[in-house]
Amino acid sequence: MTTDMRTRIRAGDPDAFAELYDQCARSVYNHAFRLTADWSVAEDVMSATFMEAWRRRASIEADGGSLRPWLLGIATNVSRSHYRSNRRYRAAAGAAATAGVAEVADHAEETAGRVDDRRRIAATLTALGSLRRPEREVLVLCLWEGLEYADAARALGIPVGTVRSRLSRARGRLRKLAEVELARKRRELTPSNRQITGDRDFVIRSAQEGNR
């Protein structure tokens, strides 16, 4: 982002701000969804983020690179407010993790692999919702959004060393939680498989008896 554009936004130029929106809206929206696990809430967070950014435009430094880290920091704070006011977050995270799964072609090995990948992704997203908020924020900014440690630190208002330590803890906890969640999902599938087998045996037996 050029210094001229920063200056224009600081001065309240609506065209420059509209350009900023076009450049960063999708990134802000995706970031909000990863933090809230709710598409509708993510839309609200995105809107509130840009409203807050406009209100705080005078705080933009004249020199610097992209304003994306600044916007993601605002979005993180807006998402925190939502998290504090919404105690149903974890249920939403679990629902979002399994929603919108696309159908795949019926090719045995490929389908089995994709189903397992889907389960792992769902388990990871559910585990993400179980992380402590500070750990989740750092993980989303650094791993999903791809911010450098320094940019993530500025976005969150914390030291770079804190970003590093939180990210290290978050990675370890996410890995363990995801494995536990994946194992739980697999255990839940077992009774269903037994029921399918039982229903099949019942139908075949009934058909055989009917032919006697």
Predicted features along the sequence, with ranges:
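A short pre-motif secondary-structure segment
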Residues: 138-142
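C-terminal edge and immediately downstream basic/flexible tail or linker adjoining helix-turn-helix-like DNA-binding
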Residues: 8, 95, 154-155, 172-212
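Short, charged helix-capping/linker segments at alpha-helix termini
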Residues: 8-19, 29-48, 59-63
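Internal acidic/polar
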Residues: 2, 81, 89-120, 192-204
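Helix-turn-helix DNA-binding motif, specifically the short coil turn and the N-cap/start of the second
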Residues: 38, 148, 157-162
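N-terminal module of bacterial RNA polymerase sigma factors
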Residues: 1-27, 204-212
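Arg/Lys-rich amphipathic alpha helix in sigma70-family domain 2
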Residues: 55-62, 73-94, 109, 117, ...
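Structural recognition of an alpha-helix C-terminal capping motif at a helix-to-coil junction
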Residues: 44-51, 55, 65-77
